Amino acid sequence: MARVISMSDAINEAMKLAMRKDENVLLIGEDVAGGAAVDHLQDDEAWGGVLGVTKGLVQEFGRTRVLDTPISEAGYMGAAMAAASTGLRPIAELMFNDFIGTCFDQVINQGAKFRYMFGGKAQVPITVRTTYGAGFRAAAQHSQSLYGLFTSIPGLKTVVPSNPYDAKGLLLAAIEDNDPVFFFEDKTSYNMKGEVPEDYYTIPLGKADIKREGNDVTLFAVGKQVNTALEAAAQLSERGIEAEVLDPRSLSPLDEDAIFTSLEKTNRLIIIDEANPRCSIATDIAALVADKGFDLLDAPIKRITAPHTPVPFSPVLEDQYLPTPDKIVSVTLELLGEPALN
C-alpha cells in the first residue's frame, strides 16, 4: 500500500527495511546515532544526524549497528571499506559530498579497485550516502554537485534519485549491490513528498525512467533538476510543445538505450545538470550522443548547467546560479525556432 511520505522518510525507511532483512547491514558516520554534536542526548531523544535522515535507527538496531564516529571522513570511510571487504554491508553517511576530498584514497584508490585487482573475487558492498546541491544557502564548501567526479571512476556506481519513490527503491538496490555505490541526495528535496509503497522493493541500477512523454524535445535531467525539467515541460505544453523528460536515475551504470530511444522520437536534446559544466555529466552525455547518435539529431545539443564558478553565498546569486524552468523554456524555444519568452 502506498502512502504519501517525504524523500527523507523514504530514505530512512529503506535503511530500516535493509537492516531488518540482513543483519550484516550497518550504518556508520558522523552523528548518525545522535544529534548534531550533542553528546548528552539519550538514544530515545537522538535526532539522527544534522538533517534527521537516520532518526530512529539507533533505537531499533542499537549502537553496535548504528555507529557514531569522530569527525574523520578518512577514518570511518576506511573502516567502512574494510568492513565491506570482509563480508559486511555498511551504509556510510558522508554528511556533504564536498568532504570527499579527505578520503579519496580510501574510496577511489582502494574500494573502487578491489574487485578488479583481485580478479573479480573480492567484493566491496558499501553504499555511501551523501548530500549534494545548491539552493540550501550553505555557501561554496557545502553546496557542490560532485556526482560527475565519481561517475568518472571505474569501479564505482553512482545514483541520483529525483523523488521519494525512486529514492527508496534505488537505495535498497544499492545496498544489495556487491560493488561500491555512491547515493547522492539533494538537501533541498528532503521535504519533497510523493507516493511510496510500504513494502520492500528495488529499482534496478542502470534503468532510466521517462517522467513525462513527449515528441518535440528530450530533456535529460539529473537528480533534483528532473523536477525543474518537469515544471518547464508543463509550461512548454501550454505553448503546444511536448517535451519528454528523461530521468537517468543512475549515472553509472547509465541507460544509454533510453537516451537513444527518446531521441528517435524527438530528434532534439537538452541536458539539465546543476553541476559545473567542464568535465561534467552534461558534457559526457553530449559527447555520447554526438558519437553514437548524431544522425538522430535535427538540431545542436544544448546544455543548461551551473556556471564554472564556486556556489555563491548570496541568495540572489545562488538562485541565478542554478538551472530554472524559465531557462529551460527559453533554450527550448530557441532550439525549436519559436518566439522567445516575453
Curated annotation (Swiss-Prot):
One Gene Ontology MF term: oxidoreductase activity
SMART domains: Transket_pyr (SM00861)
Annotated metabolic or biological route of this protein: Ketone degradation; acetoin degradation
Species of origin: Bacillus subtilis (strain 168)
Gene of this entry: acoB
Isomerase among keywords: no
Descriptive protein name: Acetoin:2,6-dichlorophenolindophenol oxidoreductase subunit beta
Domain of life: Bacteria
Function according to Swiss-Prot or TrEMBL: Catalyzes the 2,6-dichlorophenolindophenol-dependent cleavage of acetoin into acetate and acetaldehyde.
Subunit structure: Tetramer of 2 alpha and 2 beta subunits.
Pfam families noted in UniProt: Transket_pyr, Transketolase_C
Keywords for this protein: Acetoin catabolism, Oxidoreductase
